[in-house]
Amino acid sequence: MFHELYVRWAQFGVFCPMMRSHGADAPREIFLYGKAGEPVYDALVDAIKLRYSLMPYIYSTSWEVSHRNSTFMRALFMDFLSDPKTWNMGSEYMFGSSFLVAPVLHAQYTPEQAQQILKENEGWGCKAQESDIPLLSVDFTQSKEMELYLPAGSQWYDFWTNEVAEGGQKLKVTTVFNRIPLYVRAGSIVPLGPDVQYVTEKKWDNLKVCVYPGADGNFVLYEDEGNNYNYENGAYTEIPMIWNDAKRTLTIDARRGCYEGM
């Protein structure tokens, strides 16, 4: 169960302001969880790659949070107050203005017998013997199911398939081991960055800009030097993007501002 939930924690971490694998005297590096071609390793790689690809969106949202008093992780009622079904929703949230995240919170693959052994050995200094935990027969290639709710007042796009669903309904969705349910609000503009090993490996010269039709939308791409506080003195740029849904046009305005090395 530890391996399974470690993957789920990593997938949840992708959609937190800071993604960090932290622990005391516990293995955290992905190469300690298998090798390429094995489900746990591959799922961790997928999560890390997704996080890096979302950096333009995440960094720009960080600017919205700090400069315009916005919020990163938003309870659904903050954006959909007119929908009473969101008022007490504790298993989903908005990540910025675009993403509805429904993390997998419980083990779906680990046999119940193994889960019981681990529960009985919880706590500091209490460790179940590996030989006591029957994980060898776990098939991570199987599909599972979970329920989620899409708030009323918007259409929603499945991030993985681009299938569109109307808001205001509960869905039973298929889950797989290497990803969690993830939806994008209609009208969103989401910039995706290059495939990198670390954030500053490549410049954002050729971003992929994804538009999700169904409503008007806007987004401001924010950039700065990335390694200092010069932005506090105006060393940053903004590129406004506007989606007109009726005309099906995306307008990318001129860059505003400047910083060293841009």
Predicted stretch roles:
Residues 1-179, 183-185:
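Catalytic-domain carbohydrate-binding cleft regions of carbohydrate-active enzymes
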